[in-house]
């Protein structure tokens, strides 16, 4: 469910007054993750690496209250659920978006991931969940990337998690991940907590 809230009645009141009209309100943090356990769990459970990473992102985000509030134009909205947006390569060589509702059940999330992304790819038609707070993702696995900075626009204020190809060495597998968010939604400290919790979720797989 999505409802409008009065900014002054939330913990983001000061941030709303400071950053809502800023021409560049987005913040990007980058952290290098140890994804060794993620890769092993992916193979053990038969779940695609990116699907399992998206579930981990949802798991980490679901425990942080700032993820349930999002600015939109000159208003602030509160949500009671989270979904992950996937960029899908479609059958015509273009791309579409696909929203997948987060659930605590990783296997169920993976099933929906496979079903919905295949449907979107075949139909070349995006699928959106309007009543969920959307965490955007973008996996550019064609090459290794150190950092990704997304666009600054008032048309897309949602948090965005982005990564390239993971890197293997003798002892571990690492993956730099970039996280962009709107300063009205959260502060840098909240973003850092999310990245740390994401690593902890991965470590527990």
Region annotations inferred by a language model:
Residues 90-145:
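Helical lid/core segments from catalytic subdomains that handle acyl or acyl-like groups
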Residues 2-8, 20-52, 66-82, 135, ...:
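Gly/Ser/Thr-rich phosphate-binding loops and adjoining beta-strand/alpha-helix segments
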Residues 38-63, 175-194:
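Acyl activation and transfer enzymes in specialized metabolism, enriched
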Residues 1-13, 20-24, 37-41, 58, ...:
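Domain-scale detector for complete catalytic domains at protein termini or as standalone homologs
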């Amino acid at each position: 469910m999505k409802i409008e809230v009065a900014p002054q009645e939330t913990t983001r009141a000061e941030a709303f007054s400071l950053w809502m009209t800023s021409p560049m309100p987005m913040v990007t943090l980058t952290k290098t993750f140890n994804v060794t356990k993620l890769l092993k769990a992916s193979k053990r459970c038969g779940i695609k690496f990116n699907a399992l990473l998206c579930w981990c992102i949802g798991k980490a985000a679901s425990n942080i209250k700032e993820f349930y509030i999002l600015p939109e134009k000159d208003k602030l909205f509160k949500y009671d659920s989270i979904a992950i947006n996937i960029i899908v390569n479609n059958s015509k060589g273009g791309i579409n978006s696909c929203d997948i509702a987060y659930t605590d059940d990783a296997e169920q999330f993976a099933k929906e991931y496979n079903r919905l992304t295949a449907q979107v790819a075949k139909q070349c038609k995006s699928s959106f969940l309007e009543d969920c707070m959307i965490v955007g993702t973008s996996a550019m696995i064609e090459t290794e990337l150190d950092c990704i900075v997304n666009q600054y626009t008032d048309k897309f204020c949602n948090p965005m998690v982005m990564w390239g190809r993971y890197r293997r060495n003798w002892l571990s597998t690492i993956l730099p991940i970039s996280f962009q968010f709107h300063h009205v939604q959260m502060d840098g400290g909240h973003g850092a907590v999310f990245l740390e919790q994401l690593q902890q979720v991965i470590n527990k797989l």
